[in-house]
């Protein structure tokens, strides 16, 4: 194994090249090694580590929707990248077009390689001619002074799930992760109504929601005039402020969806400020195409854009919103021309830090379609898979497209991020009896697995279509929360997983799920008398203690 082209060994080193200088240290830590340091100059795409590639690897996509899966490193074929969604596939798509790529970390049986942060550079791994190579992508930005390297750890132990959990703990410590003690439950409009939501249907569900164990009532995409024009409503919707008022009057925490780093070509904000977006050759650069429109990315290096973002979210907070689902966040990190000479990752972090400052420490931010590592420490919850859907999706390609099957798979393979990076959002439960192709068993499989994983539980249905079976599944899912989950065979290639969780509201539980046959087997050991206590340490980590006494 080589580090910055040198034989791997403990110590402090200096690498001086024509365009850049790296000062780095290799130190022994629990279960492995840590490489840290600093760089100045023009490092470009900086090679950090090189070693022999394993055959079977767990690879990870850089953002919420992308797959996290086990693949054969030597039989991998690069995917066809949809030009409309180029940057959801990779922020360095030229790599993915040629090689197997994994962002932030990569795992094999008994070993995990993982970067602990993404504050300036984009960290990724590529398999090149039988070798696993770790890179830091600096996007051709020049640094006059030294800036910190994103630290890299190499962890080894026969227990691979333990290594992934340890890696996630180190990431949480490095980034002062936000891990709320309380996990909100709620309702979301999207997976029943999509863009056809009306205020009349919203009010109907608001009344029905009082019969469900929900705290948050979140309005998703459909209310806004256009992408970017978030404070102007359409159709029969009242003002954004009135929506929050009515939700709060009915006893719920008001929640709202935005895609804050995106503006459509038809939006007022773009037409009034065409210079606010990331450019290519001096012209607005399409970040992606959706809603039958070109979508541009806000230039988050511009002070006036950050001021606009702050005003937007501080206004939403003043209106009463306390739950913010912020979506399509990858747009903030697309490569391109920005006003300031900073990396796309630095720009993204400026944007998300501005939103956090605007909504306050007591608001809940749910990230979605987001770069993962750069968001740690800013969001409270994070979507960690593609959109679910009212169908299983056995014929849907595993490329981030909506499907219940792949959404649940990612909740399983990214399980270790939960309670360490943030709260994992596996996407919404769909429990209605009509207007869905999901079978009763598929609904149970999805819901119970999310419960055993201790994930966020948000339901998305026309609540008038949820009958006794759906209510029973929701109740039983909530009773599976509160534990410490572990996917024991995380390196499974056949989509069959064994998940255990200790200390849940139902005691110690185990669920064996098969995402191909859609079968599951749930075992409960019975309730324990142990009470779970959460203590937040000074370094930001949550520690979990189980004490004798009545359960909470």
UniProtKB/Swiss-Prot annotation:
Domain of life: Bacteria
Stored CDD domains: GH_D (cd14790)
Thermal response of activity: Optimum temperature is 90-95 degrees Celsius when using synthetic substrate p-nitrophenyl-alpha-D-galactopyranoside. The half-life of thermoinactivation is 6.5 h at 85 degrees Celsius.
pH dependence: Optimum pH is 5.0-5.5 when using synthetic substrate p-nitrophenyl-alpha-D-galactopyranoside.
First-tier enzyme category under EC: hydrolase
Description of how activity is regulated: Inhibited by hydrolysis product alpha-galactopyranose and to a lesser extent by beta-galactopyranose, its mutarotational product. Inhibited by synthetic cyclopropyl carbasugars.
Catalytic reaction equation(s): Hydrolysis of terminal, non-reducing alpha-D-galactose residues in alpha-D-galactosides, including galactose oligosaccharides, galactomannans and galactolipids
Keywords: Carbohydrate metabolism, Glycosidase, Hydrolase
Zinc listed as a keyword: no
Effect seen on changing residue 402 to D: Increased transglycosylating activity at high concentrations of p-nitrophenyl-alpha-D-galactopyranoside substrate, which could be useful in industry and medicine for the synthesis of different p-nitrophenyl-digalactosides
Record-annotated active site: 327, 387
Keyword check for Phosphoprotein: no
UniProt effect for mutating residue 387 to A: Less than 1% of the wild-type enzyme activity with p-nitrophenyl-alpha-D-galactopyranoside as substrate at 80 degrees Celsius
Role, per record: Hydrolyzes the short-chain alpha-galactosaccharides raffinose, melibiose and stachyose.
Family that this chain belongs to: Belongs to the glycosyl hydrolase 36 family.
Assembly: Homodimer.
Name the record gives this protein: Alpha-galactosidase
Organism: Thermotoga maritima (strain ATCC 43589 / DSM 3109 / JCM 10099 / NBRC 100826 / MSB8)
């Amino acid at each position: 194994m080589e580090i910055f082209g040198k034989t791997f060994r403990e110590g402090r080193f200096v690498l001086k090249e024509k365009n850049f200088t790296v000062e780095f240290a290799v130190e022994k830590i629990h279960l492995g090694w840590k490489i840290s340091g600093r760089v100045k100059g023009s490092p470009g795409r900086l090679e950090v580590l090189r070693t022999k590639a394993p055959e079977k690897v767990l690879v990870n996509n850089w953002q919420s929707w992308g797959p996290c899966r086990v693949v054969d490193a030597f039989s991998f074929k690069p995917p066809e990248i949809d030009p409309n969604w180029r940057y959801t596939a990779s922020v360095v798509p030229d790599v993915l077009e040629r090689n197997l790529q994994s962002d932030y970390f990569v795992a094999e049986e008994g070993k995990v390689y993982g970067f602990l942060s993404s504050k300036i550079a984009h960290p990724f791994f590529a398999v090149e001619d039988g070798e696993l190579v770790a890179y830091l992508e600096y996007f051709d930005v020049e640094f006059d002074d030294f800036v910190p390297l994103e630290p890299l750890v190499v962890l080894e132990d026969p227990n691979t799930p333990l290594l992934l959990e340890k890696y996630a703990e180190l990431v949480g410590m490095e980034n002062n992760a936000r891990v709320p003690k309380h996990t909100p439950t709620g309702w979301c409009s999207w997976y029943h109504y999509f863009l056809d939501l009306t205020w009349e249907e919203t009010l109907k569900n608001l009344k029905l929601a009082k019969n469900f164990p929900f705290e948050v009532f979140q309005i998703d995409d459909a209310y806004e005039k256009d992408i970017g024009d978030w404070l102007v409503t359409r159709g029969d919707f009242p003002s954004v402020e009135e929506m929050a008022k009515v939700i709060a009057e009915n006893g719920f925490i008001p929640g709202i969806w935005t895609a804050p780093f995106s503006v459509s070509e038809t939006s007022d904000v773009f037409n009034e400020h065409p210079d606010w977006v990331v450019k290519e050759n001096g012209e607005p650069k399409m970040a992606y195409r959706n809603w039958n429109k070109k979508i541009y990315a806000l230039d988050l290096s511009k002070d006036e854009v950050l001021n606009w973002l702050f005003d937007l979210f501080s206004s939403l907070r003043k209106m009463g919103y306390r739950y913010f689902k912020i979506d399509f966040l990858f747009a903030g990190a697309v490569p391109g021309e920005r006003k300031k000479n900073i990396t796309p990752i630095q720009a993204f972090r400026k944007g998300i830090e501005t939103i956090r400052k605007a909504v306050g420490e007591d608001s809940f931010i749910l990230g979605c379609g987001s770069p993962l590592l750069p968001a740690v420490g800013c969001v409270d919850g994070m979507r960690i898979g593609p959109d679910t859907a009212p169908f299983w999706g056995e014929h849907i390609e595993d490329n981030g497209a909506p499907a219940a099957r792949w959404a649940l798979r990612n909740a399983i393979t990214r399980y270790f991020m939960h309670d360490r990076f943030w709260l994992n959002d596996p996407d919404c439960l769909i429990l209605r009896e009509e207007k869905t192709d999901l079978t009763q068993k598929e609904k149970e499989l999805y819901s119970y697995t999310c419960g055993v994983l201790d994930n966020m539980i948000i339901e998305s249905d026309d609540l008038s279509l949820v009958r006794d079976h759906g209510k029973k599944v929701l109740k039983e899912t909530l009773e599976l929360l509160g534990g410490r989950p572990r996917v024991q065979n995380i390196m499974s290639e056949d989509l069959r997983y064994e998940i255990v969780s200790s200390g849940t509201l139902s005691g110690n539980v185990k669920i064996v799920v098969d995402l191909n046959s859609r079968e599951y087997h749930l075992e409960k050991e019975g309730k324990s008398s142990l009470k779970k206590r959460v203590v937040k340490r000074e370094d930001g980590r949550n520690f979990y203690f189980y004490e004798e006494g009545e359960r909470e």
